[in-house]
């Protein structure tokens, strides 16, 4: 959720730090992007339908997600979703996706 908030607020330095931490912790960056895609899709569903039952958002963060979904214009969430979808295609066969992920997230922040 944090990375979506910094993309929306146009803070390009934050995604770099988040991705670097995930990388240093030895976590799978491709899996992170897949999970991010699912999360942004759920935010779009929430924004469009206002029905939290159509999402897989955990109850403990639902209130924050509702705020993000209602305060963010749907075109902006769709732009983020489109960028993440494109990123998923690009990293499919990438051996070291860190640089590609960082660059795509910077672009999303500065759009």
List the predicted regions and their residue ranges.
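Extended, largely alpha-helical regulatory/partner-binding modules appended to the mid-to-C-terminal parts
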Residues: 1-111
């Amino acid at each position: 959720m944090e990375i979506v908030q910094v993309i929306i607020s146009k803070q390009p330095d934050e995604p770099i730090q988040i991705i670097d931490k995930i990388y240093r912790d030895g976590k799978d960056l491709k899996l992170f992007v897949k999970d991010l895609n699912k999360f942004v899709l759920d935010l779009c569903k929430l924004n469009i339908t206002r029905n939290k039952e159509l999402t897989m958002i955990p109850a403990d963060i639902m209130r924050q997600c509702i705020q993000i979904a209602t305060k963010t214009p749907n075109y902006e969430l769709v732009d983020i979703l489109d960028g993440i979808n494109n990123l998923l295609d690009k990293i499919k066969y990438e051996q070291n996706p860190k640089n590609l992920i960082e660059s795509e997230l910077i672009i999303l922040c500065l759009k």
